[in-house]
Swiss-Prot record:
Recorded name of the encoding gene: rpmB
Family: Belongs to the bacterial ribosomal protein bL28 family.
Region (Disordered): 1-25
Signal peptide annotation: none
The protein's name: Large ribosomal subunit protein bL28
Gene Ontology biological process terms from the UniProt entry: translation
Gene Ontology MF: a single term: structural constituent of ribosome
InterPro entries recorded: Ribosomal_bL28, Ribosomal_bL28/bL31-like_sf, Ribosomal_bL28_bact-type, Ribosomal_bL28_sf
Length: 77
């Protein structure tokens, strides 16, 4: 399963760990993904999503119906 948020599309980024001596080693910055079952009142059912914390906040702000409509328009849900 890919580490990509279904709502925002956030994916892992690459960067560097930088030590005190300024030595650099490659690392990955992973999105804060959560698996959530979210109740959709209009469909009278739960929807299971793998979303980042930013995606959860987006659902709180815009509502699950609006977010699901965007997902379906993109062909993801």
């Amino acid at each position: 399963m890919a580490r990509v948020c279904q709502v925002t599309g956030k994916a892992p980024m690459s960067g560097n760990n930088v030590s005190h001596a300024n030595n650099k080693t490659k690392r990955r910055f992973l999105p804060n993904l959560q698996s959530r079952r979210i109740w959709v009142e209009s469909e009278n059912r739960f929807v299971r999503l793998r979303i980042s914390n930013a995606g959860l906040r987006l659902i709180d702000k815009n509502g699950i119906d609006s977010v699901l409509a965007d997902l379906r328009a993109r062909g993801e849900a």
